From Swiss-Prot:
Xref: PROSITE patterns: CYTOCHROME_P450 (PS00086)
Transmembrane segment boundaries: none
Gene field: Cyp1a1
Requisite cofactors: heme
Pfam family, one: p450
Gene Ontology, cellular component aspect: endoplasmic reticulum membrane; mitochondrial inner membrane
Keyword Lipid biosynthesis assigned: yes
Residues annotated for substrate binding in this entry: 228
Name of the protein in its database record: Cytochrome P450 1A1
Length: 524
Protein backbone atom coordinates (compact mmCIF):
# COMPACT_ATOMS: atom_id res chain seq x y z
CA UNK A 1 0.00 0.00 0.00
CA UNK A 2 1.22 3.57 -0.61
CA UNK A 3 2.75 5.58 2.21
CA UNK A 4 1.46 8.95 3.31
CA UNK A 5 4.19 10.69 1.26
CA UNK A 6 3.28 8.96 -2.00
CA UNK A 7 6.32 6.62 -1.93
CA UNK A 8 6.09 2.81 -1.90
CA UNK A 9 5.58 1.42 1.58
CA UNK A 10 7.93 -1.46 0.96
CA UNK A 11 11.41 -1.35 -0.65
CA UNK A 12 13.19 -4.50 -1.72
CA UNK A 13 16.59 -5.32 -0.29
CA UNK A 14 18.12 -5.02 -3.79
CA UNK A 15 16.70 -1.52 -4.29
CA UNK A 16 17.87 -0.46 -0.86
CA UNK A 17 21.38 -1.81 -1.50
CA UNK A 18 21.51 -0.03 -4.89
CA UNK A 19 20.42 3.28 -3.34
CA UNK A 20 23.03 3.02 -0.60
CA UNK A 21 25.72 2.15 -3.16
CA UNK A 22 24.85 5.15 -5.36
CA UNK A 23 24.83 7.44 -2.32
CA UNK A 24 28.21 6.16 -1.14
CA UNK A 25 29.73 6.53 -4.62
CA UNK A 26 28.40 10.07 -4.91
CA UNK A 27 29.69 10.92 -1.45
CA UNK A 28 33.12 9.44 -2.31
CA UNK A 29 33.33 11.40 -5.58
CA UNK A 30 32.50 14.66 -3.81
CA UNK A 31 35.06 13.95 -1.09
CA UNK A 32 37.71 12.87 -3.60
CA UNK A 33 37.37 15.99 -5.72
CA UNK A 34 37.10 18.36 -2.79
CA UNK A 35 40.36 19.92 -1.62
CA UNK A 36 41.04 20.37 2.07
CA UNK A 37 41.29 24.12 2.71
CA UNK A 38 43.19 25.56 5.69
CA UNK A 39 41.23 27.65 8.15
CA UNK A 40 40.95 31.29 7.11
CA UNK A 41 41.31 30.57 3.38
CA UNK A 42 38.77 29.85 0.65
CA UNK A 43 38.59 27.67 -2.45
CA UNK A 44 38.77 29.76 -5.64
CA UNK A 45 35.25 30.30 -7.01
CA UNK A 46 34.08 29.12 -10.41
CA UNK A 47 31.13 27.77 -12.37
CA UNK A 48 29.77 24.26 -12.13
CA UNK A 49 31.24 21.91 -14.71
CA UNK A 50 29.94 18.86 -16.53
CA UNK A 51 30.88 15.31 -15.54
CA UNK A 52 34.00 13.92 -17.19
CA UNK A 53 34.74 16.95 -19.41
CA UNK A 54 34.50 19.67 -16.76
CA UNK A 55 34.48 23.13 -18.37
CA UNK A 56 35.88 22.18 -21.78
CA UNK A 57 32.73 23.38 -23.55
CA UNK A 58 32.74 26.61 -21.53
CA UNK A 59 36.34 27.35 -22.49
CA UNK A 60 35.59 26.68 -26.16
CA UNK A 61 37.69 27.68 -29.16
CA UNK A 62 38.71 31.09 -27.79
CA UNK A 63 39.82 30.47 -24.19
CA UNK A 64 41.24 33.99 -23.78
CA UNK A 65 37.77 35.46 -24.36
CA UNK A 66 35.72 32.93 -22.39
CA UNK A 67 38.05 33.02 -19.38
CA UNK A 68 38.08 36.83 -19.46
CA UNK A 69 34.28 36.77 -19.24
CA UNK A 70 34.45 34.33 -16.32
CA UNK A 71 36.94 36.60 -14.53
CA UNK A 72 34.42 39.44 -14.73
CA UNK A 73 31.96 37.21 -12.87
CA UNK A 74 34.21 35.34 -10.43
CA UNK A 75 37.23 37.62 -9.98
CA UNK A 76 40.96 37.53 -10.65
CA UNK A 77 41.45 34.09 -9.06
CA UNK A 78 38.95 31.52 -10.30
CA UNK A 79 38.91 27.77 -10.74
CA UNK A 80 37.68 25.59 -13.57
CA UNK A 81 38.07 21.92 -14.39
CA UNK A 82 39.37 20.57 -17.66
CA UNK A 83 38.39 16.95 -17.59
CA UNK A 84 38.87 16.03 -13.95
CA UNK A 85 41.87 18.34 -13.49
CA UNK A 86 41.38 21.53 -11.46
CA UNK A 87 42.91 24.60 -13.12
CA UNK A 88 43.30 27.98 -11.44
CA UNK A 89 43.00 30.94 -13.83
CA UNK A 90 44.73 34.21 -12.93
CA UNK A 91 43.65 37.58 -14.31
CA UNK A 92 44.33 41.18 -13.32
CA UNK A 93 47.78 42.76 -13.48
CA UNK A 94 48.23 43.10 -9.71
CA UNK A 95 47.16 39.51 -9.05
CA UNK A 96 49.45 38.13 -11.76
CA UNK A 97 52.40 40.19 -10.48
CA UNK A 98 51.71 38.98 -6.95
CA UNK A 99 51.77 35.36 -8.10
CA UNK A 100 54.62 35.35 -10.62
CA UNK A 101 56.91 38.01 -9.13
CA UNK A 102 56.33 38.50 -5.40
CA UNK A 103 55.43 34.81 -4.88
CA UNK A 104 57.51 33.66 -7.82
CA UNK A 105 58.97 30.61 -6.08
CA UNK A 106 55.44 29.33 -5.38
CA UNK A 107 54.30 29.60 -9.01
CA UNK A 108 57.48 28.82 -11.01
CA UNK A 109 56.62 25.19 -11.76
CA UNK A 110 55.26 23.66 -14.95
CA UNK A 111 52.40 21.14 -14.91
CA UNK A 112 53.37 17.61 -15.87
CA UNK A 113 51.25 17.59 -19.03
CA UNK A 114 51.46 14.68 -21.44
CA UNK A 115 52.08 16.92 -24.47
CA UNK A 116 55.03 18.56 -22.67
CA UNK A 117 56.76 15.17 -22.42
CA UNK A 118 56.70 14.93 -26.23
CA UNK A 119 58.66 18.16 -26.75
CA UNK A 120 62.37 17.34 -27.15
CA UNK A 121 61.77 13.99 -25.46
CA UNK A 122 60.57 15.70 -22.30
CA UNK A 123 63.90 17.48 -21.75
CA UNK A 124 62.89 20.99 -22.78
CA UNK A 125 64.05 23.70 -20.39
CA UNK A 126 60.89 25.68 -21.21
CA UNK A 127 58.28 22.93 -20.84
CA UNK A 128 59.91 20.55 -18.35
CA UNK A 129 58.23 20.51 -14.89
CA UNK A 130 61.65 20.73 -13.19
CA UNK A 131 62.16 24.10 -11.49
CA UNK A 132 65.08 23.27 -9.19
CA UNK A 133 68.81 24.15 -9.22
CA UNK A 134 69.56 22.16 -12.40
CA UNK A 135 66.83 23.99 -14.33
CA UNK A 136 67.95 27.37 -12.94
CA UNK A 137 71.59 26.72 -13.93
CA UNK A 138 70.63 25.73 -17.47
CA UNK A 139 68.40 28.78 -17.79
CA UNK A 140 71.30 31.04 -16.76
CA UNK A 141 73.52 29.34 -19.31
CA UNK A 142 70.96 29.86 -22.08
CA UNK A 143 70.51 33.52 -21.13
CA UNK A 144 74.26 34.14 -21.13
CA UNK A 145 74.72 32.41 -24.48
CA UNK A 146 71.88 34.39 -26.03
CA UNK A 147 73.30 37.64 -24.69
CA UNK A 148 76.83 36.86 -25.90
CA UNK A 149 75.77 36.30 -29.49
CA UNK A 150 73.17 39.02 -29.86
CA UNK A 151 73.79 41.97 -27.55
CA UNK A 152 77.59 41.56 -27.50
CA UNK A 153 79.55 43.59 -30.05
CA UNK A 154 81.49 42.26 -33.03
CA UNK A 155 84.86 44.06 -33.26
CA UNK A 156 85.08 43.39 -37.01
CA UNK A 157 81.68 44.93 -37.80
CA UNK A 158 80.43 48.52 -38.03
CA UNK A 159 77.24 47.42 -36.26
CA UNK A 160 76.92 47.94 -32.52
CA UNK A 161 76.22 44.24 -31.88
CA UNK A 162 75.66 40.89 -33.58
CA UNK A 163 71.88 41.29 -33.46
CA UNK A 164 72.02 44.68 -35.19
CA UNK A 165 74.31 43.28 -37.87
CA UNK A 166 72.07 40.29 -38.64
CA UNK A 167 68.77 42.22 -38.55
CA UNK A 168 70.12 45.05 -40.73
CA UNK A 169 71.29 42.56 -43.33
CA UNK A 170 67.95 40.71 -43.39
CA UNK A 171 65.79 43.86 -43.34
CA UNK A 172 67.65 45.32 -46.32
CA UNK A 173 67.36 42.05 -48.20
CA UNK A 174 63.63 42.02 -47.39
CA UNK A 175 63.20 45.52 -48.85
CA UNK A 176 64.87 44.39 -52.09
CA UNK A 177 62.85 41.17 -52.19
CA UNK A 178 59.52 42.96 -51.74
CA UNK A 179 60.41 45.47 -54.46
CA UNK A 180 61.21 42.60 -56.82
CA UNK A 181 57.93 40.81 -56.05
CA UNK A 182 56.01 44.06 -56.60
CA UNK A 183 57.64 44.52 -59.99
CA UNK A 184 56.84 40.94 -61.02
CA UNK A 185 53.39 40.33 -59.48
CA UNK A 186 52.07 43.63 -58.10
CA UNK A 187 50.99 42.29 -54.69
CA UNK A 188 52.14 39.73 -52.12
CA UNK A 189 51.65 38.05 -48.74
CA UNK A 190 54.30 39.65 -46.47
CA UNK A 191 54.33 36.75 -44.01
CA UNK A 192 55.76 34.46 -46.69
CA UNK A 193 58.94 36.55 -46.91
CA UNK A 194 59.07 37.94 -43.38
CA UNK A 195 59.13 34.52 -41.74
CA UNK A 196 62.24 33.54 -43.71
CA UNK A 197 64.07 36.77 -42.79
CA UNK A 198 63.35 36.31 -39.08
CA UNK A 199 64.37 32.64 -39.26
CA UNK A 200 67.65 33.72 -40.82
CA UNK A 201 68.41 36.03 -37.88
CA UNK A 202 67.95 33.29 -35.27
CA UNK A 203 69.83 30.79 -37.48
CA UNK A 204 72.77 33.21 -37.66
CA UNK A 205 72.79 33.59 -33.88
CA UNK A 206 72.31 29.88 -33.11
CA UNK A 207 74.21 28.25 -35.99
CA UNK A 208 76.45 31.02 -37.36
CA UNK A 209 75.09 30.85 -40.88
CA UNK A 210 72.70 32.68 -43.17
CA UNK A 211 70.61 30.87 -45.77
CA UNK A 212 69.30 32.00 -49.14
CA UNK A 213 65.55 32.59 -49.03
CA UNK A 214 64.92 29.63 -51.33
CA UNK A 215 67.25 27.27 -49.47
CA UNK A 216 65.42 24.01 -48.81
CA UNK A 217 67.07 23.47 -45.43
CA UNK A 218 65.89 26.87 -44.17
CA UNK A 219 62.42 26.39 -45.63
CA UNK A 220 62.12 23.04 -43.85
CA UNK A 221 62.83 24.79 -40.51
CA UNK A 222 60.22 27.44 -41.28
CA UNK A 223 57.62 24.89 -42.34
CA UNK A 224 58.17 22.74 -39.26
CA UNK A 225 57.79 25.75 -36.99
CA UNK A 226 54.60 26.86 -38.74
CA UNK A 227 53.13 23.36 -38.52
CA UNK A 228 54.03 23.20 -34.82
CA UNK A 229 52.03 26.37 -34.15
CA UNK A 230 49.06 25.16 -36.19
CA UNK A 231 48.93 21.74 -34.54
CA UNK A 232 49.35 23.02 -30.98
CA UNK A 233 46.60 25.56 -31.55
CA UNK A 234 43.96 22.86 -31.34
CA UNK A 235 44.98 21.96 -27.78
CA UNK A 236 45.23 18.52 -26.23
CA UNK A 237 42.33 17.21 -24.15
CA UNK A 238 44.59 14.18 -23.49
CA UNK A 239 46.62 16.43 -21.17
CA UNK A 240 43.65 16.56 -18.82
CA UNK A 241 41.70 13.39 -19.68
CA UNK A 242 44.36 10.63 -19.57
CA UNK A 243 42.22 7.91 -21.15
CA UNK A 244 42.26 9.90 -24.43
CA UNK A 245 45.98 9.19 -24.81
CA UNK A 246 45.15 5.61 -25.71
CA UNK A 247 42.51 6.45 -28.32
CA UNK A 248 43.21 7.37 -31.97
CA UNK A 249 44.08 11.09 -32.13
CA UNK A 250 45.32 12.62 -35.39
CA UNK A 251 46.33 15.93 -33.75
CA UNK A 252 48.42 14.17 -31.13
CA UNK A 253 50.03 11.94 -33.75
CA UNK A 254 50.91 15.02 -35.82
CA UNK A 255 52.34 16.70 -32.73
CA UNK A 256 54.58 13.70 -31.99
CA UNK A 257 55.72 13.55 -35.60
CA UNK A 258 56.58 17.26 -35.71
CA UNK A 259 58.60 17.08 -32.52
CA UNK A 260 60.53 14.08 -33.80
CA UNK A 261 61.29 15.90 -37.08
CA UNK A 262 62.37 19.08 -35.31
CA UNK A 263 64.58 17.18 -32.89
CA UNK A 264 66.20 15.16 -35.68
CA UNK A 265 66.80 18.26 -37.78
CA UNK A 266 68.48 20.15 -34.93
CA UNK A 267 70.49 17.07 -33.97
CA UNK A 268 71.93 16.94 -37.49
CA UNK A 269 72.97 20.62 -37.38
CA UNK A 270 74.53 20.29 -33.94
CA UNK A 271 76.36 17.09 -34.91
CA UNK A 272 78.03 19.09 -37.70
CA UNK A 273 78.99 21.74 -35.14
CA UNK A 274 80.64 19.08 -32.97
CA UNK A 275 82.61 17.90 -36.00
CA UNK A 276 83.96 21.37 -36.82
CA UNK A 277 84.23 22.71 -33.25
CA UNK A 278 87.50 24.41 -32.26
CA UNK A 279 88.00 25.31 -28.62
CA UNK A 280 88.76 29.00 -28.29
CA UNK A 281 87.10 29.81 -31.62
CA UNK A 282 83.43 30.22 -30.69
CA UNK A 283 81.29 30.96 -33.75
CA UNK A 284 77.76 31.00 -32.32
CA UNK A 285 75.47 29.92 -29.49
CA UNK A 286 75.82 26.23 -30.35
CA UNK A 287 79.62 26.44 -30.09
CA UNK A 288 79.29 28.20 -26.74
CA UNK A 289 77.09 25.41 -25.41
CA UNK A 290 79.40 22.71 -26.78
CA UNK A 291 82.30 24.34 -24.95
CA UNK A 292 80.33 24.23 -21.70
CA UNK A 293 79.38 20.63 -22.46
CA UNK A 294 83.02 19.63 -22.84
CA UNK A 295 83.90 21.45 -19.63
CA UNK A 296 81.12 19.35 -18.04
CA UNK A 297 80.00 22.18 -15.79
CA UNK A 298 77.49 24.98 -16.24
CA UNK A 299 79.19 27.45 -13.93
CA UNK A 300 81.43 27.59 -10.90
CA UNK A 301 78.45 27.59 -8.54
CA UNK A 302 76.58 24.60 -9.97
CA UNK A 303 77.94 21.08 -9.94
CA UNK A 304 75.72 20.17 -12.86
CA UNK A 305 76.82 18.40 -16.01
CA UNK A 306 75.59 19.41 -19.45
CA UNK A 307 75.01 16.40 -21.69
CA UNK A 308 75.05 16.40 -25.48
CA UNK A 309 71.26 15.96 -25.53
CA UNK A 310 70.85 19.03 -23.34
CA UNK A 311 72.76 21.09 -25.91
CA UNK A 312 70.13 20.15 -28.50
CA UNK A 313 67.22 20.95 -26.20
CA UNK A 314 68.64 24.34 -25.17
CA UNK A 315 69.23 25.32 -28.81
CA UNK A 316 65.67 24.27 -29.63
CA UNK A 317 64.32 26.38 -26.76
CA UNK A 318 66.34 29.40 -27.88
CA UNK A 319 65.24 28.95 -31.49
CA UNK A 320 61.62 28.86 -30.39
CA UNK A 321 62.06 31.92 -28.16
CA UNK A 322 63.52 33.96 -31.02
CA UNK A 323 61.44 32.90 -33.98
CA UNK A 324 57.65 32.59 -33.80
CA UNK A 325 57.12 35.48 -31.38
CA UNK A 326 59.16 37.94 -33.47
CA UNK A 327 57.60 36.82 -36.75
CA UNK A 328 54.09 37.16 -35.35
CA UNK A 329 54.84 40.56 -33.80
CA UNK A 330 56.13 42.06 -37.05
CA UNK A 331 53.33 40.45 -39.06
CA UNK A 332 50.68 42.01 -36.80
CA UNK A 333 52.56 45.34 -36.99
CA UNK A 334 52.27 45.37 -40.77
CA UNK A 335 48.54 44.69 -40.53
CA UNK A 336 48.06 47.64 -38.17
CA UNK A 337 50.16 49.87 -40.45
CA UNK A 338 48.00 49.27 -43.53
CA UNK A 339 44.76 49.67 -41.56
CA UNK A 340 46.05 52.85 -39.87
CA UNK A 341 47.85 54.87 -42.58
CA UNK A 342 47.91 57.96 -40.35
CA UNK A 343 49.98 56.03 -37.81
CA UNK A 344 52.35 54.82 -40.54
CA UNK A 345 52.90 58.41 -41.72
CA UNK A 346 53.63 59.60 -38.18
CA UNK A 347 56.25 56.88 -37.69
CA UNK A 348 57.92 57.80 -40.96
CA UNK A 349 57.88 61.50 -40.10
CA UNK A 350 59.61 60.68 -36.81
CA UNK A 351 62.21 58.57 -38.62
CA UNK A 352 62.86 61.39 -41.10
CA UNK A 353 63.23 63.96 -38.31
CA UNK A 354 65.46 61.92 -36.01
CA UNK A 355 67.52 59.85 -38.46
CA UNK A 356 66.95 61.29 -41.92
CA UNK A 357 67.71 59.31 -45.07
CA UNK A 358 71.52 59.34 -45.08
CA UNK A 359 72.02 56.45 -42.68
CA UNK A 360 70.13 53.41 -41.45
CA UNK A 361 68.39 53.21 -38.07
CA UNK A 362 70.36 51.55 -35.29
CA UNK A 363 69.40 50.08 -31.94
CA UNK A 364 70.91 53.12 -30.23
CA UNK A 365 68.17 55.24 -31.88
CA UNK A 366 65.39 53.62 -29.83
CA UNK A 367 65.24 56.26 -27.06
CA UNK A 368 64.87 58.99 -29.70
CA UNK A 369 61.95 57.28 -31.48
CA UNK A 370 59.14 57.26 -28.88
CA UNK A 371 56.28 57.12 -31.39
CA UNK A 372 57.65 53.99 -33.06
CA UNK A 373 58.09 52.46 -29.60
CA UNK A 374 54.52 53.45 -28.71
CA UNK A 375 53.26 51.82 -31.92
CA UNK A 376 55.05 48.57 -31.09
CA UNK A 377 53.65 48.58 -27.55
CA UNK A 378 50.13 49.20 -28.84
CA UNK A 379 50.55 46.36 -31.34
CA UNK A 380 51.60 44.05 -28.49
CA UNK A 381 48.70 45.20 -26.31
CA UNK A 382 45.89 45.33 -28.86
CA UNK A 383 46.72 42.04 -30.61
CA UNK A 384 47.83 40.27 -27.41
CA UNK A 385 49.12 37.59 -29.75
CA UNK A 386 50.46 35.57 -26.79
CA UNK A 387 47.13 35.38 -24.92
CA UNK A 388 48.36 33.03 -22.18
CA UNK A 389 51.75 32.22 -20.78
CA UNK A 390 52.81 28.60 -20.99
CA UNK A 391 50.88 27.02 -18.08
CA UNK A 392 52.45 27.32 -14.63
CA UNK A 393 52.02 25.09 -11.61
CA UNK A 394 52.48 25.60 -7.90
CA UNK A 395 55.62 24.15 -6.33
CA UNK A 396 54.09 24.04 -2.84
CA UNK A 397 50.84 24.73 -1.01
CA UNK A 398 50.23 28.46 -1.19
CA UNK A 399 47.55 31.14 -1.09
CA UNK A 400 46.71 34.10 -3.31
CA UNK A 401 44.22 36.87 -2.59
CA UNK A 402 42.87 34.79 0.30
CA UNK A 403 42.35 31.66 -1.83
CA UNK A 404 44.08 28.36 -1.13
CA UNK A 405 45.99 26.78 -4.03
CA UNK A 406 47.52 23.35 -3.33
CA UNK A 407 50.91 22.12 -4.52
CA UNK A 408 50.95 20.85 -8.11
CA UNK A 409 47.92 22.85 -9.21
CA UNK A 410 47.87 23.83 -12.89
CA UNK A 411 47.72 27.62 -13.34
CA UNK A 412 46.65 29.55 -16.45
CA UNK A 413 47.79 33.20 -16.70
CA UNK A 414 45.46 35.28 -18.89
CA UNK A 415 47.66 37.96 -20.47
CA UNK A 416 44.93 38.92 -22.95
CA UNK A 417 42.68 40.01 -20.07
CA UNK A 418 45.37 42.32 -18.67
CA UNK A 419 45.91 43.96 -22.05
CA UNK A 420 42.16 44.54 -22.48
CA UNK A 421 41.30 45.54 -18.91
CA UNK A 422 39.14 48.68 -19.00
CA UNK A 423 40.40 49.74 -15.58
CA UNK A 424 43.94 49.93 -16.99
CA UNK A 425 43.31 51.21 -20.52
CA UNK A 426 39.94 52.98 -20.59
CA UNK A 427 39.30 52.18 -24.26
CA UNK A 428 41.08 48.82 -24.72
CA UNK A 429 39.41 48.01 -28.05
CA UNK A 430 40.76 51.15 -29.72
CA UNK A 431 44.14 51.00 -31.47
CA UNK A 432 45.80 54.19 -30.22
CA UNK A 433 49.62 54.35 -29.91
CA UNK A 434 49.37 57.85 -28.41
CA UNK A 435 48.20 56.32 -25.12
CA UNK A 436 51.84 55.42 -24.41
CA UNK A 437 53.11 58.98 -24.82
CA UNK A 438 53.29 61.66 -22.15
CA UNK A 439 52.03 65.21 -22.88
CA UNK A 440 55.64 66.14 -23.69
CA UNK A 441 55.87 63.36 -26.30
CA UNK A 442 58.15 61.00 -24.39
CA UNK A 443 57.41 57.34 -23.73
CA UNK A 444 55.25 56.71 -20.66
CA UNK A 445 57.37 54.01 -19.00
CA UNK A 446 54.89 53.44 -16.19
CA UNK A 447 52.10 52.57 -18.62
CA UNK A 448 54.36 50.64 -21.00
CA UNK A 449 55.29 48.27 -18.17
CA UNK A 450 51.64 47.23 -17.88
CA UNK A 451 51.65 45.56 -21.32
CA UNK A 452 51.89 41.84 -20.63
CA UNK A 453 53.12 39.57 -23.41
CA UNK A 454 56.33 37.77 -22.42
CA UNK A 455 55.29 36.49 -18.99
CA UNK A 456 56.67 37.65 -15.66
CA UNK A 457 58.95 36.37 -12.95
CA UNK A 458 61.13 33.29 -12.95
CA UNK A 459 59.56 31.78 -16.09
CA UNK A 460 59.65 35.01 -18.10
CA UNK A 461 60.59 34.51 -21.76
CA UNK A 462 64.39 34.55 -22.01
CA UNK A 463 64.17 36.05 -25.49
CA UNK A 464 62.17 39.15 -24.50
CA UNK A 465 65.00 41.70 -24.71
CA UNK A 466 66.25 40.29 -28.00
CA UNK A 467 62.72 40.07 -29.39
CA UNK A 468 61.81 43.66 -28.60
CA UNK A 469 65.06 44.92 -30.15
CA UNK A 470 64.57 42.80 -33.26
CA UNK A 471 61.00 43.99 -33.84
CA UNK A 472 62.09 47.62 -33.42
CA UNK A 473 65.00 47.42 -35.86
CA UNK A 474 63.13 45.46 -38.54
CA UNK A 475 60.28 48.00 -38.52
CA UNK A 476 62.56 51.04 -38.40
CA UNK A 477 64.61 49.91 -41.41
CA UNK A 478 61.55 48.85 -43.43
CA UNK A 479 59.54 52.01 -42.74
CA UNK A 480 62.47 54.32 -43.43
CA UNK A 481 62.63 53.01 -47.00
CA UNK A 482 59.18 51.76 -48.04
CA UNK A 483 55.48 52.43 -47.53
CA UNK A 484 53.02 49.57 -46.96
CA UNK A 485 49.45 49.50 -48.26
CA UNK A 486 46.89 47.03 -49.64
CA UNK A 487 45.51 46.79 -53.15
CA UNK A 488 42.63 49.24 -53.79
CA UNK A 489 39.26 47.81 -52.78
CA UNK A 490 40.74 44.96 -50.75
CA UNK A 491 39.85 44.55 -47.07
CA UNK A 492 42.14 43.29 -44.32
CA UNK A 493 40.80 40.63 -41.94
CA UNK A 494 42.15 41.32 -38.45
CA UNK A 495 40.16 38.52 -36.77
CA UNK A 496 42.63 36.41 -34.77
CA UNK A 497 42.73 32.63 -34.86
CA UNK A 498 43.58 31.01 -31.54
CA UNK A 499 46.75 28.95 -31.29
CA UNK A 500 50.13 28.90 -29.60
CA UNK A 501 50.13 32.52 -30.75
CA UNK A 502 47.12 34.41 -32.10
CA UNK A 503 47.43 34.67 -35.88
CA UNK A 504 45.56 37.00 -38.23
CA UNK A 505 44.29 35.76 -41.58
CA UNK A 506 46.99 35.76 -44.25
CA UNK A 507 46.62 38.69 -46.65
CA UNK A 508 47.89 38.34 -50.23
CA UNK A 509 47.04 41.90 -51.24
CA UNK A 510 49.91 43.84 -49.67
CA UNK A 511 51.77 46.35 -51.80
CA UNK A 512 54.88 48.45 -51.19
CA UNK A 513 56.41 51.45 -52.85
CA UNK A 514 59.71 53.17 -52.24
CA UNK A 515 59.29 56.40 -50.35
CA UNK A 516 59.27 59.41 -52.62
CA UNK A 517 62.46 61.16 -51.56
CA UNK A 518 65.86 60.23 -50.24
CA UNK A 519 68.50 57.74 -51.37
CA UNK A 520 67.54 54.09 -51.71
CA UNK A 521 70.92 52.76 -50.62
CA UNK A 522 71.77 53.95 -47.14
CA UNK A 523 74.90 53.66 -45.06
CA UNK A 524 74.64 51.18 -42.22
Amino acid sequence: MPSMYGLPAFVSATELLLAVTVFCLGFWVVRATRTWVPKGLKTPPGPWGLPFIGHMLTVGKNPHLSLTRLSQQYGDVLQIRIGSTPVVVLSGLNTIKQALVRQGDDFKGRPDLYSFTLITNGKSMTFNPDSGPVWAARRRLAQNALKSFSIASDPTSASSCYLEEHVSKEANYLVSKLQKVMAEVGHFDPYKYLVVSVANVICAICFGQRYDHDDQELLSIVNLSNEFGEVTGSGYPADFIPVLRYLPNSSLDAFKDLNDKFYSFMKKLIKEHYRTFEKGHIRDITDSLIEHCQDRKLDENANVQLSDDKVITIVLDLFGAGFDTVTTAISWSLMYLVTNPRVQRKIQEELDTVIGRDRQPRLSDRPQLPYLEAFILETFRHSSFVPFTIPHSTTRDTSLNGFYIPKGCCVFVNQWQVNHDRELWGDPNEFRPERFLTPSGTLDKRLSEKVTLFGLGKRKCIGETIGRSEVFLFLAILLQQIEFKVSPGEKVDMTPTYGLTLKHARCEHFQVQMRSSGPQHLQA
